[in-house]
Amino acid sequence: MDIAIQHPWFKRALGPFYPSRLFDQFFGEGLFEYDLLPFLSSTISPYYRQSLFRTVLDSGISEVRSDRDKFVIFLDVKHFSPEDLTVKVQEDFVEIHGKHNERQDDHGYISREFHRRYRLPSNVDQSALSCSLSADGMLTFSGPKIPSGVDAGHSERAIPVSREEKPSSAPSS
């Protein structure tokens, strides 16, 4: 008896019960048929594979990095300007909110809104937090870490979003 073995790389496109990009951070960009009916791809043929081109190149998912020296969040917000974004720190959390009112695009009228909340490590220096938006729409929130035993100064405050004219140096997914 022959059994078809699929490489794990294909599982995202082929898995009938694998979550689609429906709940990813695409901020109102269109959906594909397989986002609504993912089981169809596996019923056609076990070897049928949907295109991953857009998913790989334009995932829109945030990335959080925390190493020994710093804490960084990368978030794709290409449909928002700095005026549409609010970044604030409350206790041990950073909250990023984006909203733009209804405006016309190529397909009609659209409005977008998102809210993300991330827990800050306890040793991040909250007085030195910064946030910038690159020319290609990548929001970078970062803060240095301090040695243990030093007070990190937890308070509520807004972090201004500065605009950079160069593209982001964030890794592409």
From Swiss-Prot:
The modification Phosphoserine is found at S45, S122. Residues 144-173 are annotated as: Disordered. The modification Deamidated glutamine is found at Q6, Q50, Q90. Residues 1-63 are annotated as: Required for complex formation with BFSP1 and BFSP2. Acetylation at Lys-70 may increase chaperone activity. GO terms for molecular function: metal ion binding; structural constituent of eye lens; unfolded protein binding. Signal peptide: none annotated. Zn(2+) 2 binds at H107. The modification N-acetylmethionine is found at M1. Zn(2+) 1 binds at H100, E102. The modification N6-acetyllysine is found at K70, K99. Glycans are attached at S162. GO terms for cellular component: cytoplasm; nucleus. Keywords: Acetylation, Chaperone, Cytoplasm, Eye lens protein, Glycoprotein, Metal-binding, Methylation, Nucleus, Phosphoprotein, Zinc. Transmembrane segments: none annotated. Heteromer composed of three CRYAA and one CRYAB subunits. Inter-subunit bridging via zinc ions enhances stability, which is crucial as there is no protein turn over in the lens. Can also form homodimers and homotetramers (dimers of dimers) which serve as the building blocks of homooligomers. Within homooligomers, the zinc-binding motif is created from residues of 3 different molecules. His-100 and Glu-102 from one molecule are ligands of the zinc ion, and His-107 and His-154 residues from additional molecules complete the site with tetrahedral coordination geometry. This is Alpha-crystallin A chain. The gene is CRYAA.
